[in-house]
Swiss-Prot record:
Species for this entry: Chlamydia abortus (strain DSM 27085 / S26/3) (Chlamydophila abortus)
UniProt-annotated location(s): Cytoplasm
Enzyme Commission code: 6.1.1.19
Identification of the protein by name: Arginine--tRNA ligase
Entry-linked SMART domains: Arg_tRNA_synt_N, DALR_1
Lineage summary: Bacteria, Pseudomonadati, Chlamydiota, Chlamydiia, Chlamydiales
Keywords in alphabetical order: Aminoacyl-tRNA synthetase, ATP-binding, Cytoplasm, Ligase, Nucleotide-binding, Protein biosynthesis
Length: 562
């Protein structure tokens, strides 16, 4: 139970006891924004004033009378009727012991679900670019957190490995005798050439469409080339996933191809199809455009595939929740998709599906992050540059480091910096990509969080301790100790709000706050050789474990030295 949920339960019982005419209530409890106002604040007295026809302060006084003061150093009424709660140091000491146990086992939910998270999803025969970065990083982070709290998570890579583009590419490869391609770079060049020819040569276009049919019909030659194209692409994708430490299971669009005719047939049986301009569409009230599920030439599109995927994930994967992580530009598509899936019965209710949309990555001028020639920046090149920038940062700020030490640390710092900069931005917002900012040692950066963790490793080395014990106990005396204890106990709340909103920046904000509290504690409270060394090392152990856990959930790696 979090401190927030504990207070919510106390206030609910107090309100219902003080005012029996109120049948039910979900108390409005928030973390206090200033230490002056205690640890937490109840805001319900003002909200109940109109219903109860009483002054808010009188309501607050009635509520406070119903609450036991055992675990609090103070419960005060402030302003118009805010109830400010400050926990006692004894209660915080005991709560830290419970927190230590929960931290080791994970904050397990009582009713674990099957959660399918669809993220990354690059296209075959094309380089992954900076646009895939956010989907990959955000999706991985959410998957890690859902797993941490006990859910059964299926991470799916909905790779674009089917459609007209493959007929075009296969035809070009056959006719240009380029079947000995070895790299994704080769494929990308050939894809661009094929695309130009497809647009300019009507006969080539017809042959490409014939090859699409051949591929869909299982023609051995077309199939063999398609498999080769996929294998080369996936090998390049996996290289990036290895660098970013991403675990994901491939299930491309082609997987759902056998189910597409059945989807159309089922939608027609349920009278959901309307023929519009010779195409089969599903119209929904409140939307200006329909969801087209079959083109006028009888071909299927990605909406048909997405419907088949939605149905399969519910019926075969037994998903209780389906989360798809793509850019905000696809919001309307997924709104129409959800409406259609609900109407068709592929989704049991509105609580199953969530589209996790995200904003753009921008350059220093606020424009979409691209090369000077206007092309998307290749993700592999971006990651390589991040490592180079991390090397430069270490050489500047850590001149005493050997080349070997820098080479070992730079990949970790580079990937941490990129991930944290992305995840610390509200996912629906655009953000400006800046290596200079993301590799800073101060501010809300991965380097700053890691420095807090490394500082604890330094304490251990100086004391000759290999591992700090989580079996001890706290003895809070100083204000900085109290602030640090409270910060630690708020980690489960950060996890809760991150999962509720599906926004990782709540977790990064928490880690930044915790690291600041730890640095203040380190500044104010002498540890090594202090009469309180044991108790303060216990707080260090909890911070170390919390930072390591939080960084892991973000997909970041730790280092013992920086």
């Amino acid at each position: 139970m979090t401190l927030l949920s504990y207070l919510s339960s106390l206030c609910r019982e107090a309100i219902l006891s003080a005012f029996p005419q109120i049948e039910t209530i979900s108390p409005d409890i928030t973390q206090s924004t200033k230490e002056l106002f205690g640890h937490y604040q109840c805001n319900d007295a003002m909200k109940l004033a109109r219903t109860l026809k009483m002054p808010p302060r009188a309501i607050a006084e009635s509520i406070v009378k119903q609450i036991s003061k055992n675990n609090f150093s103070s419960i005060e009424i402030a302003g118009a009727g805010f109830i400010n709660f400050t926990f006692s140091k004894e209660f915080l000491n005991l709560s830290l012991q419970s927190y230590s146990r929960d931290l080791s086992s994970g904050f397990r939910v009582q009713d674990p679900k099957k959660v399918v998270i669809d993220f990354s999803s690059p296209n075959i025969a094309k380089d992954m670019h900076v646009g895939h970065l956010r989907s990959t990083i955000i999706g991985d982070c959410l998957a890690r957190i859902f797993t941490f709290v006990g859910h059964d998570v299926l991470r799916l890579n909905h790779i674009g490995d089917w459609g007209t583009a493959f007929g075009m590419l296969i035809t070009y490869l056959q006719e240009e005798s380029s079947e000995d391609i070895e790299s994704l770079e080769d494929l990308t060049i050939l894809y661009k050439k094929a695309h130009v020819r497809f647009a300019e040569d009507a006969e080539f276009k017809k042959r490409s469409q014939t090859n699409v049919v051949a591929l869909q019909s299982g023609d051995p030659k077309a199939r063999k080339l398609w498999e080769r194209i996929c294998e080369i692409s996936e090998r390049a994708f996996q290289k990036i996933y290895n660098i970013l430490d991403i675990q994901i299971e491939k299930r491309g669009e082609s997987f759902y191809n056998p189910f597409l005719p059945e989807i159309i047939e089922d939608l027609e049986k349920k009278n959901l199809i309307t023929v519009s301009d010779e195409a089969k569409c599903v119209f929904h009230e409140g939307f200006s455009i329909p969801l087209m599920v079959q083109k006028r030439d009888g071909g299927y599109n990605y909406a048909t595939t997405d419907l088949a995927a939605m149905r399969y994930r519910v019926e075969q994967d037994h998903a209780d929740r389906i989360i798809i992580v793509t850019d905000m530009g696809q919001s309307l598509h997924f709104q129409l998709l959800e409406a259609t899936a609900l109407a068709a019965g592929y989704l049991p209710n509105k609580d199953v599906f969530s589209h996790v949309g995200f904003g753009l990555v921008l350059d220093s001028e606020g424009k979409k992050f691209k090369t000077r020639s206007g092309e998307n920046i290749k993700l592999q090149e971006l990651l390589d540059t991040a490592i180079d920038q991390a090397v430069a940062t270490l050489k500047k700020h850590r001149p005493e480091m050997s080349d070997a030490e820098i080479t070992e640390r730079a990949p970790v710092l580079g990937m941490n910096a990129i991930k944290y900069a992305d995840l610390s931005s509200h996912r629906v917002s655009d953000y400006v990509f800046s290596f200079e900012k993301m590799l800073r040692f101060e501010g809300n950066t991965a380097m700053f969080i890691l420095y807090g963790y490394v500082r604890i490793q330094g304490i251990k080395r100086r004391l000759g301790i290999e591992k700090l014990s989580l079996e001890s106990a706290a003895n809070i005396q100083e204000p900085s100790e109290e602030a640090l204890a409270l910060a630690l106990l708020r980690f489960p709340e950060a996890i809760d709000i991150t999962l509720k909103e599906l926004c990782p920046h709540f977790l990064t904000d928490y880690l930044y706050m915790l690291t600041n509290k730890f640095h203040a504690f380190f500044r104010d409270c002498h540890i090594e050789g202090s009469p309180h060394q044991k108790e303060r090392l216990y707080l260090c152990a909890l911070v170390e474990k919390t930072l390591a856990t939080g960084m892991h959930l973000l997909g970041l790696q730790t280092l013992d030295r920086l």
